[in-house]
């Protein structure tokens, strides 16, 4: 399951190159998701990614937010 999620993230990243960047964090949310799933597996990695996406909004401070 993790490999499928990682492939979907890579597919998203491939197509998102053609849109303006909107993530205020470093690494970007998609890269964070890829790292989290690769490190923690499908379930915990997806949970961390969803929490990160919820924090990524125009009123957030942004900045460095590495995978724990």
From Swiss-Prot:
Cellular component, GO annotation: plasma membrane
Annotated compartments: Cell membrane
Keyword check for Iron-sulfur: no
Major site of localization recorded for this protein: membrane
InterPro entries: Membr_insert_effic_factor_YidD
UniProt KW Cell membrane keyword: yes
Keywords: Cell membrane, Membrane
Domain of life: Bacteria
Membrane topology category: Peripheral membrane protein
PANTHER family recorded: MEMBRANE PROTEIN INSERTION EFFICIENCY FACTOR-RELATED
Entry-linked HAMAP family: UPF0161_YidD (MF_00386)
Family as reported in the entry's similarity comment: Belongs to the UPF0161 family.
NCBIfam families found in the cross-reference section: membrane protein insertion efficiency factor YidD (TIGR00278)
Protein purpose: Could be involved in insertion of integral membrane proteins into the membrane.
Entry protein name: Putative membrane protein insertion efficiency factor
Species of provenance: Herpetosiphon aurantiacus (strain ATCC 23779 / DSM 785 / 114-95)
């Amino acid at each position: 399951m993790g490999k499928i999620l990682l492939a979907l993230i890579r597919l998203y990243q491939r197509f998102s190159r053609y849109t303006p960047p909107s993530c205020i964090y470093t690494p970007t949310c998609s890269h964070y998701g890829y790292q989290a799933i690769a490190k923690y597996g499908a379930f915990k990695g997806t949970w961390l990614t969803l929490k990160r996406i919820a924090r990524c909004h125009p009123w957030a401070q942004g900045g460095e937010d590495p995978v724990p």
